């Protein structure tokens, strides 16, 4: 059996291809999962596809493009990697930030140097690997969330809803001040629920104390999928929620076409943090002062109060 002898330049070239492929595959996995987790909420298919490519798949596309350029034109591709690393560090970090130097600039300079010196042979095989593995990762990781999102039900009912099941019966506020489309801090969410009018349409100048934030247990027990209660149970000792059926971003609790995927709950972890619930049922502690657009709230009141 003939022994294959690789030159140093071949080893360097294939090492560069392997690193590029690994990074692109990681971004393919992350991007397609995040796309269907927090993205894909527009009513327009064009907007959903555009957001997917521009925001979630762009890191994979960048690394794929750089790898293909470097395989075909090693020195141009090597310089492109260096410029990309410097540009990303400049855009994403403070120029004097050591994290930027260690996690972005130096790795990209190193990868660029490997492509500059290396010569992966045969190039055609290198191209197929650099493109094929990330695309395979993209498809394999994207099938389940794509099918799940495509199968979501939506009844276009954004009014106040009585949700009864799993030992919990509550009225969940209608779209508006009691159920907004943008995020607020935990303290602001608590304040708004306290000031929300009885009909849930406006905020009063003084606390009405009709509405409130749901507790973690109430939110977990109310979760559903395809209008079937998910059988959620909240273990306060381990801070873990368990379900018989995995919940999803569907009515009566969630708005399919809203960017909001997390809700504040009334349950505090400590003075600085409170628990939030995700549409898929997970529960995480977050600092009360943060207010990203995708973290909002939905006020609740006892169902008996609606009579």
Feature map (PLM): residue ranges:
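Extracellular adhesion/carbohydrate-recognition regions
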Residues: 148-211, 296
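Aromatic-anchored segments of alpha-helical transmembrane domains
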Residues: 23-30, 82-94, 137-144
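Hydrophobic cores of alpha-helical transmembrane segments in multi-pass inner/ER membrane proteins
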Residues: 59-68, 103-116
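Short, structured beta-strand segments at or near domain termini in extracellular proteins/domains
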Residues: 262-264, 285-307
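Central hydrophobic cores of alpha-helical transmembrane segments
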Residues: 74-88, 130-133
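An exposed tryptophan-centered "aromatic clamp" motif
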Residues: 194, 198-208, 216-276
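Internal/C-terminal transmembrane anchor helices
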Residues: 124-150
């Amino acid at each position: 059996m003939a022994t294959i002898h690789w030159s140093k330049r071949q080893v360097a070239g294939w090492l560069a291809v392997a690193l590029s492929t690994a990074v692109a595959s990681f971004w393919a996995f992350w991007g397609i999962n995040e796309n269907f987790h927090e993205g894909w909420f527009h009513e327009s298919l064009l907007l959903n596809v555009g957001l997917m490519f521009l925001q979630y798949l762009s890191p994979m596309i960048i690394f794929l493009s750089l790898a293909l350029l470097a395989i075909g034109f090693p020195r141009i591709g090597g310089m492109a990697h260096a410029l990309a690393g410097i540009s990303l560090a400049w855009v994403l970090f403070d120029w004097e930030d050591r994290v930027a130097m260690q996690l972005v600039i130096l790795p990209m300079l190193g990868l660029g140097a490997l492509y500059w010196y290396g010569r992966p042979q045969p190039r055609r095989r290198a191209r197929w690997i650099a493109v094929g593995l990330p695309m395979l990762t993209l498809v394999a990781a994207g099938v389940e969330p794509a099918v799940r999102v495509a199968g979501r039900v939506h009844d276009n009912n954004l009014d106040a809803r009585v949700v009864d099941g799993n030992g919990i019966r509550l009225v969940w506020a209608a779209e508006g001040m009691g159920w907004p489309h943008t995020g607020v801090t935990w303290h602001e969410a608590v304040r708004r629920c306290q000031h929300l009018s009885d009909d849930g349409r406006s905020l009063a100048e003084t606390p009405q104390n009709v509405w409130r934030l749901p507790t973690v247990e109430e939110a977990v027990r109310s979760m559903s999928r395809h209008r079937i209660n998910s059988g959620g149970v909240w273990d306060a000792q381990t801070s873990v929620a368990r379900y018989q059926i995995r919940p999803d971003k569907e009515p009566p609790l969630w708005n399919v076409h809203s960017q909001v995927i997390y809700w504040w709950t009334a349950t505090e972890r400590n003075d600085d943090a409170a628990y939030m619930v995700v549409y898929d049922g997970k529960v995480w502690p977050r600092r009360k002062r943060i207010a990203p657009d995708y973290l909002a709230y939905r006020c609740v009141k006892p169902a008996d109060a609606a009579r």
